[in-house]
């Protein structure tokens, strides 16, 4: 069994906008690849501090390549020690893809590499997943499950947990639980 700490990203600009604008906030170009709000940064920092109390070290960190998740991961890593060669981005951790939700359109790989050189982007294809259009829940569950099954094999026997930072719907599909911003669940899989 591998211990996973599954974290939803902190509050993003699109989450804040959705409180006043509703679902149209997700399609607003100003929220493309939404960044964390000031509140979201504080939430991510607090999650890192809380995680560190029980697990000061992690075996690895895997993260969605969307900016809000990377920012959440960076703030968690301010508290939790993660080996520099074990910090990864993976498209399987993206939020459920919907053609109109530009908040879930990630940056190009070259831009991600320039902005976040500490992350291994070998598992992020040049072409983003949003071109596929509407993604059904069972497809999200399948891609998340495939990655988790792979990580269970890779990290079998690990002493410290593996941290995964991603999105509400992606986590819901595998956990059956909706997490608030920067909430996390510890699961042995």
What are these regions, as identified by a protein language model?
Residues 1-4, 16-17, 22, 47, ...:
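Acidic, low-complexity terminal tails and accessory targeting/binding regions
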Residues 3-7, 62, 160-170:
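Beta-strand elements within well-structured catalytic alpha/beta cores of enzymes
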Residues 65, 83-103, 124-131:
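A short, structured active-site edge motif that brings together acidic residues
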Residues 12, 170-171:
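Short active-site segment of divalent metal-dependent hydrolases/proteases
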Residues 2-85, 98, 119, 182-185:
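Active-site-proximal alpha-helix that buttresses catalytic centers in soluble enzyme cores
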Residues 36-41, 134-141:
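Conserved AMP-binding/adenylate-forming core of the ANL superfamily
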Residues 140-156:
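A short, acidic, amphipathic alpha-helical segment used as a generic capping/interface helix at domain edges
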Residues 30, 114-136:
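Short glycine/proline- and acidic residue-enriched helix-loop micro-motifs
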